[in-house]
């Protein structure tokens, strides 16, 4: 009966604010330029944007071809409406009706309030459905309701109102905690604004408390749990910017100002001006290097004072300007002397601590503990100049895809990192939580650690060392030498060996742990599965010292450059490996 009341409530609610949307001729010109890149992808038959399939490797069972994206289509619809051009209104309304029709509106359903990623893959076929789509799509629909509802037909306006409230109820039901940074913020935005817009008192009380908890969580630590993420720190910045623009509650706005500052500090403090890259470590990232879209954001956020020659128009730049605090701007343009940043991202015993060393010739970042999921960059470095930048990062691959069960540990001193890897019996395969290894067992034909190079050095070919403990030396112009070493690597009875390769865009140096016929691997049966490595960015006359490695008492112990590290060598649950 409670669900029936909810449906009636959703249907009967009406918005309580009017639009004040304005756009000047210069802004309109840039918006139209951004829209032109999408106009050719509009499919009038399906009334959505059509695009080549792409995914992070989970949630979807699709493998390729072309798809119609719910989120991209809504972004396009908002952009069409933002022009204020009545001739584009029918297309925008058609998209809204089509995408809203794909939302699960049944309160008794497990997927209530969310959308599929693609028209071609209904919620029941996703693996699993992505509950974040209530947040992402709800946010976009709120832009329509706040700024363009009065231009919509009564039928479409009602559909938008109801859809937003279904999304808000879904977000409330799921109740994501403050550790899930970008969704914690985005869900707070949707529920805060929906409550104010539609007079939803219970949602409002929930949203204010949720946002208060996130504010306390982030500001007490001075960092986000999804730390230093080139992808999600920007998402967090954008959504806090929306809170500051649209939320009326004074306390929520005051809290948002502090979180907004925190996001910009994280970006500025980790930026490396010589390479124009966002230095690591990164908790979540879909690409190792930032590029024109990020540099354009910096240009727009500083009114052109940070100018790297890119100012690409964004669909939402008018509604979301995201100004950078003026006192942080110099971090994007100046680095005359080396600077080290030590940051506790997650307190605890032990804590998660990131180290970032910014040198005029390079940037090297590492985290003291984590894993090697596809989105992680726990050990990553950049060097070169802005137009000839290179990067290297550490990966663990299972049949060519990142193995999330690989646990990572490191210590760093300036340009030197001592690191080690072991494996968790209950860790993830392709995803840390959505694809966990069952019974410590999986099938594999290849397991390897990889030092992967991108940029200029991604097009070079390397010679692999003859012996495992022989360091790789890479001579870089400008007095910089890079050393990579793996003094120890064991996988059961196998000792690792070096291989090298490239695909034209990336080059790599691999430590192969197993390669052969596909077989079942039970991690619990491996008495030993561990590796140690050292990375040194050397300047001047600095040379590489041999790493001291030994195994005793079921631990691998490493000593090098005044640093020490010890890890268990036998696979065990995450809680054992990470304690």
Positions of predicted regions on the chain:
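Aromatic-lined, polymer-binding surfaces characteristic
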Residues: 65-247
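Extended repeat-based interaction scaffolds and adjacent low-complexity, acidic/S/T/P-biased segments
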Residues: 404-579
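Bacterial N-terminal signal peptides
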Residues: 2-13
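Generic detector of solvent-exposed, compositionally biased contiguous segments
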Residues: 29-57, 348-372, 376, 384-407, ...
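Extreme N-terminal leader/anchor segments
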Residues: 19-98
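Catalytic and substrate-binding regions of extracellular carbohydrate-active enzymes
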Residues: 310-480, 489
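Signal peptide-directed secreted proteins
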Residues: 211-250, 254, 258-266, 527-579
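Carbohydrate-active enzyme catalytic cores, enriched for enzymes
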Residues: 247-366
């Amino acid at each position: 009966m409670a669900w029936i009341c909810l449906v009636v409530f959703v249907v009967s609610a009406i918005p309580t604010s009017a639009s004040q949307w304005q756009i000047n001729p210069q802004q309109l010109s840039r918006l139209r330029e951004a829209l032109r890149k999408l106009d050719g992808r509009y499919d009038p038959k399906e009334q959505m944007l059509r695009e080549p399939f792409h995914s992070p490797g989970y949630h979807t069972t699709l493998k390729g071809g072309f798809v119609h994206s719910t989120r991209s289509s809504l972004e396009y619809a908002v952009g069409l409406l933002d022009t204020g051009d009545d001739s584009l209104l029918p297309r925008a309304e058609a998209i809204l009706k089509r995408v809203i029709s794909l939302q699960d509106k049944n309160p008794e359903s497990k997927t209530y309030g969310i959308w599929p990623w693609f028209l071609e893959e209904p919620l029941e076929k996703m693996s699993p459905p992505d509950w974040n789509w209530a947040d992402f799509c709800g946010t976009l629909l709120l832009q329509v309701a706040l700024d363009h509802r009065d231009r919509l037909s009564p039928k479409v306006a009602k559909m938008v109102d109801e859809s937003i409230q279904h999304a808000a109820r879904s977000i409330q039901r799921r109740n994501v905690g403050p550790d899930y940074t970008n969704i914690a913020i985005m869900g707070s935005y949707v529920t805060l604004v929906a409550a104010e817009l539609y007079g939803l008192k219970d949602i409002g009380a929930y949203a204010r408390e949720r946002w208060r908890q996130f504010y306390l969580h982030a500001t007490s630590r001075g960092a986000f749990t999804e730390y230093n993420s080139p992808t999600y720190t920007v998402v967090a910045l954008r959504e806090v910017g929306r809170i500051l623009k649209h939320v009326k509650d004074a306390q929520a706005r005051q809290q948002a100002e502090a979180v907004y500052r925190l996001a910009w500090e994280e970006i500025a403090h980790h930026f490396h001006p010589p390479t124009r890259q966002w230095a690591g470590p990164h908790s979540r990232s879909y690409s190792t290097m930032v590029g024109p879209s990020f540099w354009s954001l910096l240009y727009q956020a500083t009114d052109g004072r940070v100018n790297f020659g890119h100012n690409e128009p964004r669909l939402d730049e008018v509604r979301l300007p995201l100004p950078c605090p003026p006192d942080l701007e110099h971090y994007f343009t100046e680095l005359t002397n080396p600077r080290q940043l030590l940051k506790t991202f997650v307190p605890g015993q032990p804590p998660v601590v990131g180290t970032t060393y910014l040198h005029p010739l390079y940037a090297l970042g590492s985290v003291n503990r984590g894993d090697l999921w596809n989105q992680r960059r726990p050990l990553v470095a950049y060097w070169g100049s802005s137009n000839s930048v290179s990067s290297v990062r550490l990966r663990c691959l299972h049949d060519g895809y990142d193995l999330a069960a690989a646990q990572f540990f490191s210590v760093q001193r300036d340009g030197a990192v001592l690191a080690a890897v072991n494996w968790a019996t209950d860790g993830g395969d392709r995803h840390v939580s959505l694809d966990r290894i069952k019974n410590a067992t999986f099938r594999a034909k290849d397991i390897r650690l990889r030092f992967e190079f991108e940029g200029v050095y991604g097009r070079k070919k390397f010679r692999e060392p003859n012996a495992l403990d022989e360091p790789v030396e890479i001579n870089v112009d400008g007095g910089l030498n890079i050393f990579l070493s793996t003094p120890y690597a064991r996988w059961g009875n196998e000792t690792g060996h070096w291989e090298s390769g490239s695909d034209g865009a990336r080059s790599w140096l691999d430590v192969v742990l197993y390669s052969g016929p596909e077989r079942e691997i039970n991690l619990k049966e491996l008495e030993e599965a561990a590796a140690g490595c050292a990375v040194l960015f050397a300047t001047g006359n600095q040379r590489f010292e041999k790493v001291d490695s030994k195994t005793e008492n079921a631990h691998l112990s490493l000593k090098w450059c005044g640093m020490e590290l010890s890890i268990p060598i036998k696979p065990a649950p995450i809680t054992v490996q990470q304690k």
